[in-house]
Amino acid sequence: ENLLAGPSENDPNLFVALYDFVASGDNTLSITKGEKLRVLGYNHNGEWCEAQTKNGQGWVPSNYITPVNSLEKHSWYHGPVSRNAAEYLLSSGINGSFLVRESESSPGQRSISLRYEGRVYHYRINTASDGKLYVSPESRFNTLAELVHHHSTVADGLITTLHYPAPKRNKPTVYGVSPNYDKWEMERTDITMKHKLGGGQYGEVYEGVWKKYSLTVAVKTLKEDTMEVEEFLKEAAVMKEIKHPNLVQLLGVCTREPPFYIITEFMTYGNLLDYLRECNRQEVNAVVLLYMATQISSAMEYLEKKNFIHRDLAARNCLVGENHLVKVADFGLSRLMTGDTYTAHAGTKFPIKWTAPESLAYNKFSIKSDVWAFGVLLWEIATYGMSPYPGIDLSQVYELLEKDYRMERPEGCPEKVYELMRACWQWNPSDRPAFAEIH
């Protein structure tokens, strides 16, 4: 019996692959972008589904597939994407390259973003009272696919025809390495340690390989006695709770006996600070910088919703992957907030130039102190990784801030971005914007 045959476009269990996926044991199944598959069921947390293709049966990541009649199957449909992320995705410079996106702030509201002669134009897709869709009122369509097809043959109100769908962004993160894998605790022998990537406050970070899955990973180790074991385990516990495309994903821990390990996904290009300092500025231009900042604010909005504070947000604690993907890392100081503020215990070391005044003065932390740090991080991005408060001694920073001194607008930084920095640097925490507003 051919389960994939027949006119079953409306079959709710028929899906199509959005990306290639290569099986890595544990009954996983390789799929190719565009291939049809039938979903038979999901694992305990819904992150993997059992599927059947013409090549066999096995497990695939749920976020790599989409129902066969959904919009996601179209190469031009990018789902919820912000305006400046759309401009980044269309930065290749080809006339007629385009994408269709859903508004992040108003779900259901869609737009076409279209590049022509060095500019990106945005057109709202309207819905008429009879449910038909249009950009220009004279041409109305039953479906989005029909509308896109029409405007690919005639401009009809657009600056040019829709010609080249913009490539989709990176493949999504596979949460968890296999469908059966719910044990965070790993054997140290599962990991081959390679070279050292850097040192953190509490220990070293290494590149390693998870042998079973031939997967490159980052391994954070705990220096003996530098940090309470309890604190290290708290960091791992925080990371287990967190799943967002712009937050570094925890894969496992080794906590039975020292040396302790936290194992996370590996990010190819290392920390954002070094990346900004060494990058080619022609390639990492204003559009890319804004796209990076948007990804960080998206991650922070998620932490805000979850009542987490990061407490050490800075370019050195963000990591860079392929295609300018940025993820916030280093939850070493982060805390789940039960009240609105958290008081750090005496003797905690703070990175002074990123720390909000109320945290420096009273050890008080809240999501609004993360907003202050985000303002400093924006300044780091705008200056390609300069050290904040250039020429100012650490001991003078608080006093100057108290007297209303704030860093000046970096050269080439758009006025609107600088206004956002200044809003993040309001003395009174309640006057600072929330990440939900920033993003």
UniProtKB/Swiss-Prot annotation:
CDD domains: PTKc_Abl, SH2_ABL, SH3_Abl. A motif (Kinase activation loop) lies at residues 330-354. This protein is synthesized as a Gag-Abl-Pol polyprotein. Its EC number is 2.7.10.2. Keywords: ATP-binding, Kinase, Nucleotide-binding, Oncogene, SH2 domain, SH3 domain, Transferase, Tyrosine-protein kinase. It catalyses: L-tyrosyl-[protein] + ATP = O-phospho-L-tyrosyl-[protein] + ADP + H(+). Belongs to the protein kinase superfamily. Tyr protein kinase family. ABL subfamily. PROSITE patterns: PROTEIN_KINASE_ATP, PROTEIN_KINASE_DOM, PROTEIN_KINASE_TYR, SH2, SH3. This is Tyrosine-protein kinase transforming protein Abl. The keyword Zinc-finger does not apply. Pfam families: PK_Tyr_Ser-Thr, SH2, SH3_1. It is an enzyme of class 2 (transferase). The active site is at 312 (proton acceptor). Residues 76-166 form the SH2 domain. Residues 191-439 form the Protein kinase domain. Residues 10-70 form the SH3 domain. GO terms for molecular function: ATP binding; non-membrane spanning protein tyrosine kinase activity. ATP binds at residues 197-205, 220, 265-271. The keyword Transcription regulation does not apply. It comes from Feline sarcoma virus (strain Hardy-Zuckerman 2). Gene3D superfamilies: Phosphorylase Kinase, domain 1 (3.30.200.20), SH2 domain (3.30.505.10), SH3 Domains (2.30.30.40), Transferase(Phosphotransferase) domain 1 (1.10.510.10).
